[in-house]
Amino acid sequence: MSKTKKILVVTCTKNDGKDTQLLKSMAPLSDDVKMVVNINNKCGLSKAYNKQLTPENLVYHDIVLFVHDDVYVDDLKLKGKLYTAINELEYDIVGLAGAGEIKITKPCLWHRMSRQESWSGAVSHQMELDGESKLNVTSFGPWPRRCLIMDGLFLAVDLKRVLEVGWKFNENYDFHHYDISSCLDANSKKLKMGTYPIYVTHDSPGLKDYNEPTYQQSEMRFYNEYKRG
C-alpha cells in the first residue's frame, strides 16, 4: 500500500491563532496534517479557503480540510477516517453535520430548511452545569450518510475531484451561508457529499440573533440566489 499524504488543514483566525482550540487539537496529529493558518484574517472565509484549492497543493495533499478555529478535533484517527470516507464511501466532500434535503425558506439555516428525518451527524459543545464545565453532544442523526447540505464548521474535500469539476467555495458569502451555498453548488456539479463519524467539540453557541444586519443581508442574498420557483 502506498503511503497516504498528509491532510492539509486550513483555518482562519482574527488573531495570531496560537491559542485557538484547533491548533491545540492538532498537536498530537502533527505526523498526519499540515496546517495553513490565515492569521489576523479580514477577508471572507470563501476567498481565504479558495486560495488553497490549487493544483500545486495536489502534489503533497489528496485531502484539504477546512475547519473553524474554535473547533477542537478530538479524534486521533482523523486522517484514516477522512481517507476512508473519500476512498471507500467515495465522498467528494466530507462533513460532520447536515441534511439530505432542503427547501429554501427563511430563516435560511440548514436545520430549519430540512426535515429532521434527513439530518445526519453529531457535534459536541461545551456547557456549564452545577458550576462545572461539561460536554453536551448534539446528535442530529445517523452517520455516515449522504447529504445535500452540511455545516461549514468542518468540511474536507477530495482536492483532485473538486479541481476536476471546477468547484470552489461561493465567494458571494463571507461567513453566513458560505457553507450551504457552496454545498448546493457542489451538488450541481455532481459532487458526492456526506457525513462521517469524526469527533469534535465546537466552542461556539451558533447564531445568536437572526435580526443581526450582516446575517439578514446574507440571508436575503442566499434566498434570492437559490430559491426555486
For every predicted segment, state its role:
Residues 42-56:
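Glycine-rich, basic loop-to-helix element that forms the pyrophosphate-binding segment
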Residues 82-165:
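Conserved catalytic core of nucleotide-sugar-dependent glycosyltransferases
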Residues 164-172:
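Conserved nucleotide-sugar donor-binding catalytic segment
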Residues 71-85:
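Acidic donor-binding/catalytic loop of UDP-sugar-dependent glycosyltransferases
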Residues 61-72:
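Short beta-strand-to-loop acidic/aromatic patch adjacent to the donor-nucleotide binding site
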Residues 11, 15-30:
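Short, well-formed alpha-helical segments that are part of the catalytic scaffolds
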Residues 171-229:
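C-terminal catalytic/acceptor-binding lobe
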Residues 5-11, 34-37:
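Hydrophobic targeting segments
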